Amino acid sequence: MSAETSTTPAPAENTNGTPDNAPAPEVTAVEAPATTSQPHSASLYVGELDPSVTEAMLYELFSSIGQVASIRVCRDAVTRRSLGYAYVNYNDTAHGERALDELNYTLIKGKPCRIMWSQRDPALRKTGQGNVFIKNLDSAIDNKALHDTFAAFGNILSCKVAQDEFGVSKGYGFVHYETAEAANNAIKHVNGMLLNDKKVFVGHHISKKDRQSKFEEMKANFTNIYIKNIDPEVEDEEFRKLFEKFGEITSATLSRDSEGKSRGFGFVNFSTHESAQAAVEEMNDKEVRSQKLYVGRAQKKHEREEELRKQYEAARMEKASKYQGVNLYVKNLTDDVDDDKLRELFGPYGTITSAKVMRDTAPVETATPESETKESANKENEKAAEGEKEPAAEEKEKEEKKEAEQKPEKKPLGKSKGFGFVCFSSPDEASKAVTEMNQRMVNGKPLYVALAQRKDVRRSQLEASIQARNNIRQQQAAAAAGMGQAYMAPAVFYGPGQQGFIPGAQRGGMFPPQPGMMMGMPGRPGQYPGPFPGQQGGRGVGPNQQIPPNFQGLPMGAMQGPGIPNGMGYPMVQGQFGGGRGRGQVPGMGGPMRGGYGGGRGGVPLGGQMRPGQGGRGQAVGQPGPETPVGVLTAQALSAAPPQQQKQMLGEALYPKIQATQPELAGKITGMLLEMDNTELLGLLEDDEALRAKVDEALSVYDEYMKNKSDEPAAEKPKEAAQEAPAEENKA
């Protein structure tokens, strides 16, 4: 391959080699000498990758050609799932050319990769010059076979066969040539040829925008009409005579099944659009043999599906807007609250259009009647076998009719799920109900009342909160390693000797953090993210550090990593507090840390009470101070605390309950639940069933997130594991 190859525009990355714009008439104006536009670093686009392919796998493959500058697998910003393509940068352009020649269509994880030059200029990427469209391809033809077929007509920049989600060919593909002359030559020689015994069509690629405008023009000048609700007795000749009066007919046919019977619909194609339009206007809704006909423009299947999809979306949006701000979600209901009781509770606040308590679908009480019905049916069958067939059959039919009539009236009610919905006639009434009924005690339980949300909206909010915390962990890790955020945002793999870092290692030759090790986190006002940064020589807390007053209430499980035995969690913090000269009292740090640094678990002490700083001025850190009272967290106690302290108090109360059922993920789940309102969290503390339901919902979201994240490089996992517990559980 010549050096001139890299100067040509490549297709847009997001179209995977299928640019949308129409082809340019000539290519001579774009071509330039290789010496003027040749980049110093050769960048390759690698597509058609399996989602599990990582930077390390690509480095192992592409480093066999030459020295790799960097590799980046592009991932979704939220889920971090691979988008199926990557960029490989060489320092030497010759290495890029060699990789393009030797590694194109190489199997990676069982899938052939597709390599082409990367073109950052979107204007050059989307010119569409030299792009050829091929359809009616045999399913056995893949990217490599298509490339080998069309390579004889010129230099190919990109070649792709369209596939569905299962990797099966859709029967069409694209070949992007370097020049328009090569594309014209391929169209001239291959169009109409047989490939694997199938005649293929080859032509210039037309952009979607141009195709859409052409399609709209065809719709406005239609000649083919569709007729349905035709009587099955109507014959072809009679069907044709119905429409002959409107103009010249080129074809008219009735659709029939395999036995030759009419299926009740047909098509008529006129020679002019005016004739077809007149037939639609006059024959639509006209009765023929006592059946009202439907006559309209003939549509393709994909067009009908698109219209149905738009109608469904419009109906869904209309329904969502109709109930926006008027539908309330009510939970923490007792089992004795039914639909009527729920309507009675919310009736004073406005006109209620519907009120429903959600219940289990399979009540236990119905098991006995069903078994009795089966036994009686068996007895009737036995009697029928003895000669009482007709009376038994009549009685059985009567009983079935009675049961069918009674079912709508006596629908069995299952056990209440503890929540329901109330829909008002106006948003003002709904807002008033939320204000008055939220946290109101009903049958000894505080209600939670809020505007109802769809399940997908709630799930997206949880996923967004998970992603936000993941970004915070990355930023904290970058700050701890002495790097800016720009190094952590894109996951880039750098080759040996290149600028940057290898995943799992940090700058300055530091080893990656191991699970159980405590990492320094950047301090922010009102937060205590990790070991106190800014402390030097054990001189106590720096002047700009702020520690929540009730920090001593953090559970030990949230502070101790899997690699640290009980009683030895974070000795560095002890040293910073116990040694050196203390600079006055730290608010809320007096006395032993209950469940935190002050004492270990399992009978292993952490050294008891913190020793005061020797030679320090003012009150020592280890002297007794005010503590948060031990007991059940109440709404009054929560409201009395400062706003920045309320979440931590809730986290301290939630963590032991969650740890009892999910000890490994207690910190993560607690952090996820703390995104909820404080009033709702208070309800969870009092209702174990509701708490379990929320924990299960958070687990399902977290499991799905981890599945999507399972394709990340293995080298990054130890580093991430070391950061997960401190970042998530300190927040609790």
From Swiss-Prot:
It comes from the Eukaryota. PROSITE patterns: PABC (PS51309), RRM (PS50102). GO terms for molecular function: mRNA 3'-UTR binding; poly(A) binding; poly(U) RNA binding. Residues 1-26, 357-413, 706-732 are annotated as: Disordered. Residues 630-707 form the PABC domain. It holds the Pfam family RRM_1. GO terms for biological process: mRNA processing; mRNA transport; regulation of translation. InterPro entries: Nucleotide-bd_a/b_plait_sf, PABP-dom, PABP_1234, PABP_HYD_C, PABP_RRM1, RBD_domain_sf, RRM2_I_PABPs, RRM_dom. Keywords: Cytoplasm, mRNA processing, mRNA transport, Nucleus, Repeat, RNA-binding, Translation regulation, Transport. It is found in: Cytoplasm; Nucleus. NCBIfam families: PABP-1234 (TIGR01628). Belongs to the polyadenylate-binding protein type-1 family. This is Polyadenylate-binding protein, cytoplasmic and nuclear. It comes from Emericella nidulans (strain FGSC A4 / ATCC 38163 / CBS 112.46 / NRRL 194 / M139). The gene is pab1.
